[in-house]
Amino acid sequence: MPLPKFMIIATLALCLALTGCTQRPSDGSTCAECHRGLEQVSASHLECVSCHGGNPLAAAEKAAHRRMFGPKNPADPKYWEKTCGKCHPYQLERVRANLMYTNTGMIKNSQATWEGEDGVLYATRAEAVHDAGGEPLKLQKVTQLDNLAGELYRKTCSLCHVGVDSNRVWSGSHSSGCAACHFPYNDNATYQGSDRTVKGKWKHSASHKMAVLPDNSVCVRCHNRSGRIALSYEGWNDGNNSKVPTSKGHLGERVISGARNATRIQPDIHHEKGMECIDCHTSRDLMGDGYVYENMYLQTEISCEDCHGSATERPQVEEIDRENEEVLRESAHYPRRMQQGDSMVLTAKGRKYSNVLQEQGKVWVQSKRNGKLHESKVITDTPEHTIVGHERMECYACHSRSVAQCYGCHTEYDQRELGEDFIKGYKTPGRFTETEDYRMLYPFPLALNQRGKVSTVTPGCQTFVTVIDSRGRKVRDEYVTLFKGRQQLRFAPFFGHNTGPKAIGCAECHANPAFLGFGQHVVEDSSIEATLICEKSEDKPLDGYLTMQYGRV
């Protein structure tokens, strides 16, 4: 008796489903016949077509690759809803609202410091998301921002955000979408695995094996410019004359993107102890929590006080009391998985860390990669942290070893030349070039930050803009852009990621005018005279935001 047609269809569907859930390409797949030696993504990922698409039964290359996603990167935002998002919808929704993808904060601050905000929140792509209060929000695509601030972002800053495949910068390239962090490039963006069909080819991740826990090399591919936090953390500096060989005409100890020579400085104490970026930063810091924030400090959920306590309060803890808590899922990839009943330290937003716990009254940080436990010193009620008048000090105001400071950014925009628009994907009239006056690490000025606390600050940004129109006329010449309605040099609150165990001494901080915002000065009698004077602001030092006349600030 012949089987009913619906039973045949159901049986075929079941077979396809089962073969799609195998951990390696099935015997019927032709993928492995060409891609011999290709690394398995992970033990839990499905067969090739589940991520890449294509036809696994075709023998000819063109036929097999037809309708592939990418084809090299199925994690690109063009395809991620059909690929990564099918199995990881929760993570995808978080990343779609994440600052490293939307760049809303970077775009907004570019507007604020160049031509002013217009009340619209722009992003790398138009997205329907939710704001920090949970209200629906429509982000507008930054290609609609048709002014100098929009041009600046699209032609310079945007190359680092995870929505763009940045593959043209030696040692600074990365893939796009989820692959930007989880399938990292090497310095040349070439594949170095065992599959001979793509061995040494550009542009590919270094391996086909997924980096579940991205290492510091992933972070440094983007965070090596601007605030240079990835460099500072590991103890590198690309300061003044970084393109000049440093010893007997030879290159420096480390060459980084842009043919810059990086030299050694004292690294962050956490790096010295063997901690990586991911040991402090949570997945919500890096991938977002599903809500759109207008600035980085609003998305970041960690603080020094989380692990070390404040002057008056110890670190806050909470037990894992549910079997489906996110902590348990995330820590499954660590050498020591957290268990129900563990007392987990809370972030500044009141969420549990997945690797920081309290045991027998002590706070321990587990390195996510190797499982090493680091005891976190709690400073609560110690004499040196309860000094009267220091209540408003951020921890890093005293404990920063250095802060990257770039003074005098001279930006030229020439409409006679073409510049690559990385968001539009093609060249348009208008090319940016930049030079700087002076770079330094120490001393660094202090000022109030967004939390109302005394914080380290850095120029952000001191931009002198020259605009040349299509006829070669200088429309603007070394123009100091407006900020809050007037021309002024600006400083921005900034944590330099170069922390030391020993604080700056009392005399050093209180007797050095640079820490107070007067810049580096020569003190003579009752007057303070700047040694770095800005030609566009004769009464204001380039490296300070305060001036003094007749004993008054």
Each model region followed by its residue ranges:
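Accessory cap/linker subdomain of secreted extracellular hydrolases
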Residues: 373-379
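Bacterial N-terminal signal peptides that target proteins for export
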Residues: 1-10
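Short sequence/structural segments immediately N-terminal
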Residues: 21-373, 387-553
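Bacterial N-terminal signal peptides
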Residues: 9-17
